């Protein structure tokens, strides 16, 4: 079949000019729209986002976010994504995975209107966080990019209204996305991109059936992004289900230089955990913002109420609080309003880790899948500029340990991780402070040491417990005052406070956003009668030698001033008269008789 010649401006075929076979082959390849461009190898490191040839409006949004240069995962993934390749990426926390898929999706959305992108995440908190980042990056795009978040619990009427105008980007959990696809509210016929963020968590939280149903409904040719911190068997099976010949990026080695976490271990008794955390914060041994990880929510409030006795303020990230309150706590923590955040990873104990140690005590899982998945905080949520991660209760698995310490030393910064370990012979020796999850601390510690990366190791924290002996009598009274009843009252009090703020003041804060800064989440939850004000101050005699110099108060005389002397002599010997003018018999009684001495 003869090839058609190119027409000129007068619709007349131009004579075919002789050209090289290579040029002719390239022209033939351009005339076939079905064949994708040949993938070019991505650069190891890209100096700036401008080199990625992104839409100019997105580059302005990137500058507003003060993103410097692309991270390793962004340098590798974005050029491949712009070529239309499916991406299966393994990269640690804090390495810029969110930007690696958001930027190419936003770029393609601006070029091709009428297409939809679906982003699946394991939790509502992560969905809101991604929504915020996507809106910030597309701030200069006006109405060209419409973003909707349907991960939260809301009525079907509200969700249908959000999806009625076919938004460009939809963010949801797999359960919510599957439900809305079944009802027809979420149309996937024009789906261009599908993202599964934190793939290992999505599979661990039991969304396999929802993902299978979504995979059956999406059309062919959808570009896939699968992001995960680990590539286990479940994630690889998910990749084979959704992806078509994906590019596998394993970028842990490229990000090792940015992980500068100094890891320390302190082996102590159960009650000594409270003594150590009191001394560390009160004596200023921990600098900067700190996340304290504990076993469960009750444990969070026990630590908070204990620290309140000494005037140490902290806030609890409680899964029972309203979603808006939890996100506000994270935002305020990132703004350096709070320095100590107490969090729990209840999903670890609820069994989200499939290969967790069977000897661990198991709690009954909640019936509501969404409620269960909202409680974990060691993954997904971004905490900025965290200096220290304190494992008050050691995690249940070695994977959870690495996820926890991944909250610090992000974006090339250094950080510290300190872990309290309960030896076997000291477990259950102090019933009021014991925690069932600490029974196998030493076994989990061995697994952590076994899976350490090259150049990383756990060191013993050199802490002389004898120097803390003077503090024991102070911390003992404070610890005894934190009873189960006090913890229950504190939890109820905080939930009532946060519900009141969320319901009654939501409209007010929409109209007056500056007043939101006055909300504090580190309020005192202790009953006033339980707080002893003198415990807030550490006397000099309790401090180790040389920690604080005695104050110079000058010369203190022992003589009574003359004025006071005269007043004392003048008033001496006077009869004490009652208010009614009568003589006090107790002061004037004389056993020998009147007038006799």
UniProtKB/Swiss-Prot annotation:
EC number annotated for this UniProt entry: 3.6.4.13
Catalytic activity: ATP + H2O = ADP + phosphate + H(+)
One GO-annotated biological process of the protein: maturation of LSU-rRNA from tricistronic rRNA transcript (SSU-rRNA, 5.8S rRNA, LSU-rRNA)
UniProt domain Helicase ATP-binding: residue ranges: 78-249
Example GO molecular function: DNA helicase activity
Biased composition (Basic and acidic residues): 1-13
Enzyme class: hydrolase
UniProt keyword GTP-binding, yes or no: no
Disulfide bonds: none
Pfam families listed in its UniProt record: DEAD (PF00270), Helicase_C (PF00271)
Domain Helicase C-terminal residue range list: 260-469
Entry-linked SUPFAM superfamilies: P-loop containing nucleoside triphosphate hydrolases
Recorded GO CC terms: nucleolus
Motif (DEAD box): 197-200
Keyword set includes Transport: no
Subcellular location: Nucleus, Nucleolus
Span list, region Disordered: 1-43, 352-374
Keyword annotations of the record: ATP-binding, Helicase, Hydrolase, Nucleotide-binding, Nucleus, Ribosome biogenesis, RNA-binding, rRNA processing
Chain positions recorded as ATP binding sites: 91-98
Chain location of the short sequence motif Q motif per the record: 47-75
Domain writeup: The Q motif is unique to and characteristic of the DEAD box family of RNA helicases and controls ATP binding and hydrolysis.
Family that this chain belongs to: Belongs to the DEAD box helicase family. DDX56/DBP9 subfamily.
Job of this protein: ATP-binding RNA helicase involved in the biogenesis of 60S ribosomal subunits and is required for the normal formation of 25S and 5.8S rRNAs.
Protein name as it appears in the record: ATP-dependent RNA helicase DBP9
Organism name: Phaeosphaeria nodorum (strain SN15 / ATCC MYA-4574 / FGSC 10173) (Glume blotch fungus)
Primary gene name: DBP9
């Amino acid at each position: 079949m003869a090839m058609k010649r190119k027409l000129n401006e007068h619709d007349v075929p131009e004579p075919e000019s002789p050209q090289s076979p290579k040029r002719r082959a390239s022209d033939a390849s351009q005339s076939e729209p079905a064949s994708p461009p040949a993938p070019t190898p991505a650069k190891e490191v890209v100096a700036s986002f401008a080199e990625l040839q992104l839409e100019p409006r997105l580059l302005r949004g990137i500058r507003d976010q003060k993103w410097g240069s692309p991270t390793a995962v962004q340098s590798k993934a974005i050029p491949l994504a712009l070529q239309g390749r499916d991406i299966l990426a393994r990269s640690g926390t804090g390495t810029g995975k969110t930007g690696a898929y958001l930027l190419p999706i936003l770029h393609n959305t601006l070029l091709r209107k009428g297409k939809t992108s679906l982003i699946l995440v394991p939790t509502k908190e992560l969905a809101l966080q991604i929504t915020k980042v996507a809106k910030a990056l597309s701030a200069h795009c006006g109405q060209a990019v419409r973003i909707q978040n349907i991960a939260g619990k809301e009525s079907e009427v509200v969700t249908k209204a959000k999806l009625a105008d076919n938004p460009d980007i939809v963010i949801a959990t797999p359960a919510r996305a599957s439900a809305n696809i079944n009802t027809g509210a979420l149309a996937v016929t024009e789906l261009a991109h599908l993202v599964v963020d934190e793939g290992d968590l999505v599979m661990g939280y039991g969304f396999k059936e929802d993902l299978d149903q979504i995979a059956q409904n999406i059309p062919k040719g959808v570009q896939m992004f699968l992001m995960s911190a680990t590539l286990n068997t479940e994630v690889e099976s998910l990749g084979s289900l959704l992806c078509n010949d994906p590019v596998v990026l394993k970028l842990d080695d490229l990000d090792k230089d940015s992980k500068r976490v100094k890891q320390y271990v302190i082996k102590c008794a159960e009650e000594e955990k409270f003594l150590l955390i009191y001394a560390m914060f009160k004596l200023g041994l921990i600098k900067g913002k700190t996340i304290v990880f504990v076993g469960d929510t009750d444990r969070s409030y026990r630590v908070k109420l204990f620290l309140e006795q000494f005037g140490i303020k902290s806030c609890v990230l409680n899964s029972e609080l309203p979603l808006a309150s939890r996100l506000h706590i994270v935002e305020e923590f990132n703004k350096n309003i709070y320095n100590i955040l107490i969090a729990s990873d209840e999903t670890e104990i609820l069994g989200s880790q499939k290969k967790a140690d069977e000897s661990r005590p198991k709690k009954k899982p909640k019936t509501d899948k969404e409620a269960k998945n909202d409680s974990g905080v060691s993954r997904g949520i971004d905490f900025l500029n965290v200096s220290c991660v304190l494992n008050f209760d050691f995690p249940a698995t070695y994977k959870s340990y690495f996820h926890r310490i991944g909250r610090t030393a992000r974006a090339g910064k250094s950080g510290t991780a300190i872990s309290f370990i309960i030896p076997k012979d000291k477990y259950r020796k102090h019933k009021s402070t014991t925690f069932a999850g600490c029974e196998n601390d030493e076994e989990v510690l061995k697994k952590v040491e076994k899976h350490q990366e090259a150049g990383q190791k756990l060191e013993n924290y050199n802490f002389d417990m004898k120097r803390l002996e003077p503090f024991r009598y102070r911390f003992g009274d404070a610890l005894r005052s934190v009873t189960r009843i006090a913890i229950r009252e504190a939890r109820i009090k905080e939930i009532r406070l946060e519900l009141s703020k969320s319901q009654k003041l939501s409209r007010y804060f929409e109209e007056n956003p500056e007043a939101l800064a006055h909300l504090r989440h580190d309020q005192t939850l202790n009953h006033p009668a339980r707080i002893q004000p003198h415990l807030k101050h550490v006397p000099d005699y309790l401090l180790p030698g040389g920690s604080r110099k005695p104050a110079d108060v000058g010369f203190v005389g022992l003589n009574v001033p003359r004025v006071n002397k005269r007043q004392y002599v003048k008033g001496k010997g006077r009869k004490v008269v009652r208010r009614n003018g009568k003589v006090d018999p107790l002061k004037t009684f004389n056993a020998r008789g009147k007038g006799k001495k």
